[in-house]
Amino acid sequence: MKHQRSMLKNYKDLKVWKKSYELCLEIYRITAKFPKEERYGLTSQIRRSVVSIPSNIAEGYGRKTTKDYIRMLYISYGSVCELETQILLAGDLDLIEKGELGTLKKDIAEIERMLKALIKSLENKPLNP
């Protein structure tokens, strides 16, 4: 049950992958300003969560079946939820400026919507033999 990749050449053509990759870059810039004592705490946790999002999208895209692809997208979705919680915590601890926090929350919500839509579209497609 292979999944069709339609007109996309590779996972880097997916809008949700592009958006989540851009979020990775932004998160790395922001967390670079976190206090040194957070290096192995919240900084590390946030970075792991955000990197997991585009990484699992890419891995899922490379899988052989639609079922595997969807499973990896759900893992990415879980990472988005994890990241959102960590970003809220960092904001409440005043580690992220209010303006940056608002932008991050908006970007995270958009990625969440995009992932839900992609998952739904794949779940509603008939599987190839």
Task: Tell me what each language-model feature is.
Residues 1-59, 63-129:
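Short, C-terminally biased terminal segments at protein or domain edges
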